[in-house]
A protein has these predicted regions:
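Non-catalytic, conserved peripheral segments adjacent to functional cores
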Residues: 1-102, 111-112, 118-120, 125, ...
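Extracellular beta-helix/beta-solenoid repeat scaffolds
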Residues: 107-108
Length: 177
């Protein structure tokens, strides 16, 4: 499956992807481990599709659990990471010459979009323990721009003005990794 010959719509149909609320992109939860006494799955995994369309990106957010990002197909992703210690990193996930997999540590602000010149990217994320909608914390762009001024333009581009900063729990299973 090549991004030059396969369309994002074909990818979404092939894998049964649906819109990912708040964060953005199309996704499907592919696995959730057995729940603990509090209802949290032992682990969880999702597939996500992002495209080069305006407004299609993984909005800046953070999670209380490490999240492993896996590149599957298509064009590379540009992943912005703003760490709790004040450091930051702009990472390329996927080919050519990018990371095929990357662990984003708990508490790190993260957001992603298809790298310039790309059409779409199919990737996955895995968490253990698994995702619950209450884990998702959307970014306050003004706060992050003040703390990371050199990335202000990227931060604003990876935030949706007026969007909720929490993830709805609409299906009882959670809506992410």
């Amino acid at each position: 499956m090549d991004s030059r010959t396969t369309t994002a719509a074909e990818v979404a149909e092939q894998y049964g992807l649906a819109p990912l609320p708040v964060e953005g992109g199309m996704f499907r939860r592919t696995w959730a481990g057995p729940p603990d006494a509090g209802g949290r799955p032992a682990g969880s995994a999702i597939m996500v599709l992002l495209t080069d369309a305006d407004g299609d990106f993984s909005a800046l957010h953070r999670l209380p659990v490490d999240e492993v990002w896996h590149f599957y197909r298509g064009d590379p992703l540009e992943l912005l990471l703003l760490h709790p210690d004040g450091s930051d990193r702009l990472l390329r996930l996927g080919t050519p010459l990018g990371h095929p997999q990357y662990v984003v540590e708990a508490g790190t602000w993260m957001g992603a979009r298809v790298a310039a010149g790309g059409r779409w990217a199919l990737f996955g994320t895995t968490m253990a323990p698994g995702f619950l909608p209450a884990d998702y914390e959307g970014a306050d762009p003004d706060d992050l721009c003040a703390r990371h001024p050199r990335h202000a333009a990227r931060i604003r581009a990876l935030c949706r003005p007026g969007a909720p900063r929490s993830m709805p729990d609409t299906d009882g299973e959670g809506t992410r990794a």
